[in-house]
Amino acid sequence: MGIEGETVVLKNMLIGVNLILLGSMLKPSECRLEVTTERVQRQTVEEEGGASSYNTSSKEQPMVFNHVYNINVPLESLCSSGLEASAEQDVSAEDDTLAEYTGQTSDHESQVTFTHKINLPKKACPCASSAQVLQELLSRIEMLEREVSVLRDQCNTNCCQESAATGQLDYVPHCSGHGNFSFESCGCICNEGWFGKNCSEPYCPLGCSSRGVCVDGQCICDSEYSGDDCSELRCPTDCSSRGLCVDGECVCEEPYTGEDCRELRCPGDCSGKGQCANGTCLCQEGYAGEDCSQRRCLNACSGRGHCQEGLCICEEGYQGPDCSAVTPPEDLRVAGISDRSIELEWDGPMAVTEYVISYQPSLGGLQLQQRVPGDWSGVTITELEPGLTYNISVYAVISNILSLPITAKVATHLSTPQGLQFKTITETTVEVQWEPFSFSFDGWEISFTPKNNEGGVIAQLPSDVTSFNQTGLKPGEEYIVNVVALKEQARGPPTSASVSTVIDGPTQILVRDVSDTVAFVEWTPPRAKVDFILLKYGLVGGEGGKTTFRLQPPLSQYSVQALRPGSRYEVSISAVRGTNESDASSTQFTTEIDAPKNLRVGSRTATSLDLEWDNSEAEAQEYKVVYSTLAGEQYHEVLVPKGIGPTTKTTLTDLVPGTEYGVGISAVMNSKQSIPATMNARTELDSPRDLMVTASSETSISLIWTKASGPIDHYRITFTPSSGISSEVTVPRDRTSYTLTDLEPGAEYIISITAERGRQQSLESTVDAFTGFRPISHLHFSHVTSSSVNITWSDPSPPADRLILNYSPRDEEEEMMEVLLDATKRHAVLMGLQPATEYIVNLVAVHGTVTSEPIVGSITTGIDPPKNITISNVTKDSLTVSWSPPVAPFDYYEYPIDHPSGRLDSSVVPNTVTEFTITRLYPASQYEISLNSVRGREESERICTLVHTAMDSPMDLIATNITPTEALLQWKAPMGEVENYVIVLTHFAMAGETILVDGVSEEFQLVDLLPRTHYTVTMYATSGPLVSGTIATNFSTLLDPPANLTASEVTRQSALISWQPPRAAIENYVLTYKSTDGSRKELIVDAEDTWIRLEGLSENTDYTVLLQAAQEATRSSLTSTIFTTGGRVFSHPQDCAQHLMNGDTLSGVYTIFLNGELSHKLQVYCDMTTDGGGWIVFQRRQNGQTDFFRKWADYRVGFGNLEDEFWLGLDNYHRITAQGRYELRVDMRDGQEAVFAYYDKFAVEDSRSLYKLRIGGYNGTAGDSLSYHQGRPFSTEDRDNDVAVTNCAMSYKGAWWYKNCHRTNLNGKYGESRHSQGINWYHWKGHEFSIPFVEMKMRPYIHRLTAGRKRRALKF
């Protein structure tokens, strides 16, 4: 084994002994040691370039043995309380787990090194003597090592000799690498700093100055000293290895300080403006920086700015002395106000994260908030109460820090009243009704303003009134009606509507000055502006229909003519404007009985008047004849029955001769009588009668007569001798006899006597007388007519006693007729003679018994005139005259024509003709037609009649400028003077309408006609009682086009075209639309339709739409409109909300592009109507046709039919909600009952998170049953991710974001009412009702904010 081995064994034995001693030193009651030994052998090669003068083999390399001693002290035996604090501190100064002590022993000769490492647990044994025991153990180990060294020296003596003796001469000690072996001295010559037999012991300088122990060349100094040679005083904690110890004081390295260099030095020693604490300056107030050299800013600018000269220069978005406050918004302004919204704008910094808008009614109430992104500069607060003043504050928010608010006090407008309608409209009143408000306000103000802004009325009403009847309006006036809500000093926006009062008709209708054929109608004109006045009149009972006149306003009277005398009429008057007609005012009147016409005296005598007149048109039963002298002393009345035929005759008798009578004749009918037809007629003066010669002499003739009975002034006697020189004498009226004297002897005198009164002179009585004796010499014939003759003769002288007159036709002399005459008679009238017959007449004077020779004469009666003249076939320029022929033969007829111009034409008609037509007359002219017969040079008496030619008719009546509702009538005026034209307009569906046009016009515009209607127009002219012939024309109005063609709801590819139908019946419409690019399309639309939606249009294109109505082969004129389709706001919509903003307003299946990428398209069902539309429907249950009890894979990708029941897929939910913030709506229905649940946030995480559900705040009517599932992963029958003991999906036959297990189970079994098995929403129908209809839908949250449909309350 050798010395080396022995040494090793010995050393190990010694160490073991010492450990045993250590164990014995620890009392069992105090500590128990467990020692384990680990021996590690390692080989090292130390080369110190050139230090060794010999090369050694591997076995000469030093051997190092490491001994590790783990001393484990059981805790339960090391727990006394006597451990000193200092010992505890020493033990804990280094490692918190083990105290490690290392020692090394080297065998310099054998190149073996023993390393000893002892591990002791620190604080494992808090015994009172543990520290002391350990210290003693260390000392013993050191002592042991010194003893081993001495022992080794003894064992190594004569190593060379031993080697030589054993024959091992190749072994040379290494001298520990710190010297050279000398065979001469058989020992090592050590290098400087080393000593010992094998140079393995370092040399301690100065022998450690007697202040320590040299161990392995190093001084282990006493506790007060240090240094290589223990000559230096020790510094506290050896300056903590952070400085030099100089004379016991530490000269610390930078940046340390303190007596033991434990403390960090502060920069610049805090510039004298602070205290240094562990290297950090605690600056005085007002200073800052690493060295307190800088002026300090308050709160170090809160980390949101930099300090400059003690002042904080804040980052954008912050303000305040320490930059702790967020900069508030600026310039808060109100951009718009409505009744339920306020639009705000402000200016703010760019760094703002978001804005919080807080608003609350100023009178108190719920404070609500709204948050908007920080890049917004405005917001619209919606769903406010109308008419309230709100305190509004806007905060800027950065990193959840709110700024001071900028505030405003803003009042919402009062709401616009809704539902304005008119219940009752009359001429002067309008009853208005509107819907009430649900909020408090002061009252209403309603105003009626004429469209011309002239005048108007305003009324204020209580707030609980929602209807009002306004009186005192103007008829036919269009009013703008405004209803405004009032609150305090505020006025809401008005709701307006226009209404026109009913046009008033004429009032106070009065019929005056009614005559037999004319009635004068007066009325008070309507106050409204009207197009015309419609006057209708006709017989009561409807006989003959009604005549209608259109009269132009402001006419307020009209003379109705050509009435039937003695008839009961009804007249009504209304006003017309456009198609509106007022109520008619009507009254009845009876025309007067027309007076007899053409009153005339046939013959007259001194005591009688023969009267004749034309009968009245009225059905009079009799006539009342009233007559009296002009003095009116006494009235006489005679009732005369109506004569048969056109005339009635009567004779007034017992009249006063020579007196002028006033005669009035009235027609009498049913106790009523007409105005009288009057005339004055004078009776003849009563002639002195019975003029006789009572005596005669050669120079005188005595006369006697009967006194005239009437009033006269005197008598005038005219006597004319045969010499021809007449003489007159006036005799007072009271005389009845007179004697003419101084006459010529033997002369024949013609003596006549007349009674005179003023200029009136009676018929004369004549007598022939002779001075001396003279018989009747001859007969005088006068007044010869066709049936009578007047015979006169002279007085016989002396006068005869009686006279006998005989006469007979010449060929019938044997049948002479005799007439006895009084002797005083000097004339006689033979009546009843035959026309054109020669009569023989003789006169005999009887004197006593002596009869004179007869005086014979002959006379031929005249030819008789035509009889019964009548007029017929009267036209404007001709008439027909007919008559009965006379009895006597004649040659021809002659008729003169008295023209209005005064010219008299005469024409001859053969005697064989009894009817003749006279032509070339003037229209509307009065003619006197007379007719007599002529034989040779003899003419008969004339028969006469008066006649008016008819008016000539207007000519060339035509209708021009014909439109669907209008036509222009034109004509040529007749030759005669025209007062009015009467136009009668008729069509198949309406009775004739009569229009009165002024006589100076030659055209008339027809309006308000019916489209596509055939009209007949008849027309005649009137002038007084004359009416022209009728002319007529026909025309048809055109087919009217559709009206109000408009384009609305214009989107990118569609437009709604609507119109109002024409008035005429049609078969269909022809609609043509064309674009600017030249494309054109024609559609046939049913007649019942009034709108059509054009689909498939091009975007951003101008379109022209043409529409016309069609009936058979007829088409109306074109009506047109223009519109422009819109463009797509989003070319690749990523959700339904963007489709909606693109103008897609119909619910249905659409394609969305996730994140706007063409490669990520997805078919979805869009709900475009619910709550503003724009929802992606991602689940629907409605009929149970689709099985929802499926596995994980199905729920990931989705299943079902988008038009029916379906699940869109969890992957799709995640991809959609990852695009931004979405909101969720769940609609549920049970029959007519419908509820919804709304959550302002909705997201589904990805597959790695098992599609966890994230939802926001709830609102709605269904109750919040979904928040229970917040944050839960999705579970299916094959993926149980719930927290329940059972598999919820398996138990409840569904798949959901189950927890333990559910409060809503919208994917449960359809129609299953067992507890929790069906489609459940706990807060609405509980767990035992399966909801028959469910839709889950989502849309971007921003859509609600921009649409402003729902107000949300948000917390700070």
Swiss-Prot record:
Q: Where is the Fibrinogen C-terminal domain?
A: 1127-1342
Secreted listed as a keyword: yes
Q: Which residues carry this modification: Phosphoserine?
A: 723
Q: Span of the secretion signal?
A: 1-31
MF GO annotations:
integrin binding
The glycosylation sites are 55, 176, 180, 198, 271, 278, 302, 391, 469, 580, 790, 868, 873, 1034, 1044, 1259
* Tissue expression: Brain-specific. Expressed in oligodendrocytes and small subsets of neurons (mainly interneurons and motoneurons) of the cerebellum, hippocampus and olfactory bulb. Expressed in dorsal root ganglia.
Protein name as catalogued: Tenascin-R
**Which gene carries the instructions for this protein?**
Tnr
